[in-house]
């Protein structure tokens, strides 16, 4: 779907009986993009159940109505046109759609957004796949080298790092991240880890922790590690699309992204980035000959993917661009602050990411200090208050991950629920 058709579809889907205007047209008239009036026009772009409040957008994001509609049309098209859409070099109709061409257009959109080359990125099925390919494929390790990761990394990535002991013969060290987190101690934990483990060759860094929502100073960590001769693999599953940053300025080498969380594409799509001059440092999954050694796509050969899901990336990017990443960044912080501010001076409740604006977006974990069983707390929130969350058992915490479909009023209801539960302990 091209941008003009997408915007037309958006307006048609969002029509309301307010003076005959469409929501998209109304949104364009509202100059204050921080106002709840403006954000209600965005919320109305989502089909949200009314029998619970969904504050668990961190597992996967919700497609907006225009993106969902486009995805359904993509599915119908791929199904009906079948392998003709691939072409296989035999379809010569000049007007025929071609998946290879459209895939290339989507790569170009993603590359432009990141400020990188299309030959430095490849689409995967999720961030986990991207990260597994990078970690297991990193071929600069030799027996006796050390790799580091922290206790705030994503669980599957921890397992993948531990697997390097059997795969590469490395020593694997887990670092403990201090709480409360500060800008300085998030750098220091890796700096000290490298100092204490002089054979360190690789570290895994999670840009935004799925456990706490803490955003680490990745640019400084990358610079420090590079100065020590240490490579960095970065997990950006939760920061991409939720947090405004200049990716190219970070000067990273190896990164895994998710596109169905905060970007809002259909479920089942991610992205892998390898800096052009580092591609050879990640093993190929399959080789068709010596000439493919320079190509990133041979590091992520997953077989036939769901093409309709891939096509939905373009529609999701259009939708986000109509809002603007700076506005999205501010919105997520506003949603977080709306409930977190109620507990900054409350000794009963611990907020697990700091007030430093550089270190949080929307995703935030809390715990009620009198309750050790996070699962029971999560159950209470859903059973008694109809609030859907996820729990972080090792922290006795409940993670709050609002999406663009959430309102400030829903954050107030969350705060009221936490206060009531805490008062009963």
Labelled PLM ranges:
Residues 5-425:
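Pyridoxal 5′-phosphate
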């Amino acid at each position: 779907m091209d941008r003009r058709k997408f915007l037309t579809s958006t307006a048609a889907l969002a029509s309301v009986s307010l003076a005959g205007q469409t929501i998209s047209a109304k949104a364009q008239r509202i100059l204050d993009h921080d106002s709840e009036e403006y954000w209600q026009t965005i919320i109305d772009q989502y089909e949200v159940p009314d029998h619970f409040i969904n504050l668990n957008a961190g597992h996967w994001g919700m497609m907006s109505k225009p993106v969902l509609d486009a995805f359904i049309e993509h599915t119908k098209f791929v199904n009906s046109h079948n392998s003709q859409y691939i072409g296989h070099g035999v379809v010569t109709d000049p007007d025929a759609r071609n998946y290879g061409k459209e895939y290339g257009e989507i790569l170009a959109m993603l590359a432009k957004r990141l400020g990188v080359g299309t030959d430095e990125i490849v689409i995967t099925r999720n961030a986990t796949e991207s990260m597994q390919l990078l970690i297991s494929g990193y071929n600069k390790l030799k027996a006796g080298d050390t790799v580091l990761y922290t206790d705030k990394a994503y669980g599957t990535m921890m397992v993948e790092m531990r697997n390097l002991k059997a795969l590469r013969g490395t020593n694997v060290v887990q670092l403990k991240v201090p709480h409360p987190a500060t800008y300085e101690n998030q750098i220091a934990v890796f700096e000290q880890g490298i100092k204490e483990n002089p054979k360190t060759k690789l570290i895994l860094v999670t840009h935004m922790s799925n456990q706490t929502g803490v955003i680490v100073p990745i640019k400084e960590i990358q610079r420090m590690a590079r100065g020590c001769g240490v490579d960095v693999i970065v997990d950006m599953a939760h920061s991409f699309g939720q947090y405004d940053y200049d990716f190219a300025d970070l000067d990273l080498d190896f990164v895994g992204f998710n596109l169905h969380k905060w970007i809002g594409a259909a479920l089942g799509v991610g992205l892998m980035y390898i800096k052009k001059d580092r591609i050879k440092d990640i093993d190929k999954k399959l080789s068709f000959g010596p000439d493919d050694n320079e190509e990133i796509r041979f590091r992520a050969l997953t077989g036939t993917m769901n093409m309709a899901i891939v096509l939905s990336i373009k529609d999701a990017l259009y939708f986000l661009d109509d809002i603007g990443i700076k506005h999205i960044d501010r919105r997520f912080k506003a949603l977080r602050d709306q409930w977190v501010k109620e507990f900054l001076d409350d000794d009963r409740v611990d907020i697990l990411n700091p007030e430093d604006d550089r270190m949080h977006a929307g995703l935030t974990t809390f715990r009620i200090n009198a309750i050790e069983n996070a699962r029971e707390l999560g159950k209470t929130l859903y059973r008694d208050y109809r609030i859907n969350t996820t729990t972080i058992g090792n922290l006795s915490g409940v993670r709050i991950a609002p999406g663009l479909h959430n309102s400030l009023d829903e954050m107030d209801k969350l705060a009221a629920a936490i206060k009531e539960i805490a008062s009963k302990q």
